[in-house]
């Protein structure tokens, strides 16, 4: 299985399908004055932020840690690092310098690097900075995956959608 179409034909899905129903969409669409159907495809996408993923953790007094992270979500970085280190949230201080061009790729992708630098800093009891090259960054971080869906919609003369099936 190489393509999404192959997976659909063979009913081989990564996750279990979810079905949300309200009413009898096929009947309503068939009885609608107007009908459209089609297929929507969207290609996959890698986040290509301008600055690669970087995290630096500095041990502080009283088993606290200062983390500099190129993240768009410092509060969640704090929570994840605290959980990984088995510490209270208030023992982790996350600072973010100016970052530009994150395009959403630094919202959740940066946690991994902050956690690794924090584990190493705690173990070594010294500052640890983690900056990986672009190739490894692209391999390690998530993507927006390609998707395809077929749709049918029934609507009235004035454009009111009566029912849809996706």
Please place each PLM-identified region on the residue numbering.
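Structural alpha/beta core scaffold segments of enzyme domains
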Residues: 1-166
């Amino acid at each position: 299985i190489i393509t999404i179409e192959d997976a659909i034909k063979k009913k081989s899905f990564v996750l279990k399908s979810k079905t949300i129903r309200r009413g009898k969409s096929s009947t309503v669409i068939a009885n609608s004055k107007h009908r459209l159907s089609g297929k929507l495809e969207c290609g996959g996408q890698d986040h290509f932020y301008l600055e690669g993923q970087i995290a630096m953790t500095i041990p502080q007094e009283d088993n606290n840690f200062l983390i500099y992270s190129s993240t768009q979500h410092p509060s969640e970085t704090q929570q994840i690092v605290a959980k990984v280190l088995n510490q209270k949230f208030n023992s982790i201080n996350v600072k973010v310098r100016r970052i530009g061009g994150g395009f959403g790729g630094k919202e959740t992708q940066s946690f991994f690097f902050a956690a690794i630098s924090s584990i190493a800093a705690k173990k070594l009891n010294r500052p640890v900075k983690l900056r990986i090259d672009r190739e490894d960054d692209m391999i390690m971080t998530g993507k927006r995956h390609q998707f395809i869906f077929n749709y049918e919609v029934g609507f009235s003369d004035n454009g009111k959608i009566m029912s849809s099936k996706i």
